[in-house]
């Protein structure tokens, strides 16, 4: 998913 919003995964 690190292509749209990288910080949203944390």
Curated annotation (Swiss-Prot):
Name the UniProt record assigns to this protein: Unknown protein 2
Organism of provenance: Capsicum chinense (Scotch bonnet)
């Amino acid at each position: 998913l690190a292509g749209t919003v990288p910080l949203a995964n944390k």
